[in-house]
């Protein structure tokens, strides 16, 4: 199920956008693991399970100030995930299979402000994301991590059709049970581009993570 609403006032350069989405999966597959006392081994069987669903919502607003050279925008979002799976705890004949549920609520907000004229643009931005992660059967996995960042960007357009743009942001992670993930990263990117052939061709030189501070970390929360 999805719902969209968008509107834009060209005269005021003001726009609103919103989006709500809900999805649920019927008869998902989860592996059931049962101990066989006769053989001393385990039997793993795929079984249907219900309870996997996700809800997402976002709201965005952007507008120019009266002189049209300054703009501000805001982007808010919320996401809730409910995951289920069969989980076996215990050893041997004492093993018990139960239905486990993990939930993850994430709230986010991003703000931007910018100034621009014919040849120069400068912007400031900040964002925060906060999560509540819960595991019903293994509460030691529960945590409430959050990330926040703040930075600036600029772009200069030169008369000979050359453009220099750069952005820098300090990104921070906190609240993780794994202390190695709680860190600060200063990320700096830059790009130089030249347009020629009457605007029909462009050559760009781009540099990402110039300070070599960014780490590639991906996390997933499952019920199994």
For each predicted feature, which ranges?
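Exposed, low-structure sequence patches enriched in small/polar residues
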Residues: 1-224
